[in-house]
């Protein structure tokens, strides 16, 4: 039985809020040359096989001041106290938070946000970090059951997968595939001990 999903305005508004923060960012789908691995034998005829697709960085014209002004405008519209400064970390230039109550379709909303960011700016690489294996499996299921629904709306499908250190071909496809890609990973994978966990940070012959 196929599930039917209704379009909810508050979910669309949440996705639009994220998109509006970056208004002025051009639509681009840049490529780069992927790492061929230390065992690769150079062959000038197969460069295309090593083409990767990445998200275009935020253009310099969108300064922190402009981003904060956009964020504050959205916060005021939604009756949220405006932030005095942007939240950021060493690994994340902009930390934008959308708070939603349980059971109102948070996963649906951020999948829709991915589609909207791709539609407006060409961004196609997304990593979803979840706090537990149980939630990870639930997110994966949500991608499955909403796939046809979003494909009908946007005319394309997200390629999604669960990170597994023993299936590195999935990571390779994540980089080399030009469509929208989402990697689902639980936070413990970054903090775990052992050989498999360390593979996240290793340079491997396969690449």
Name every feature range the model reports, one short phrase each.
Residues 1-207:
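RecA-like P-loop NTPase motor core of helicase/translocase proteins
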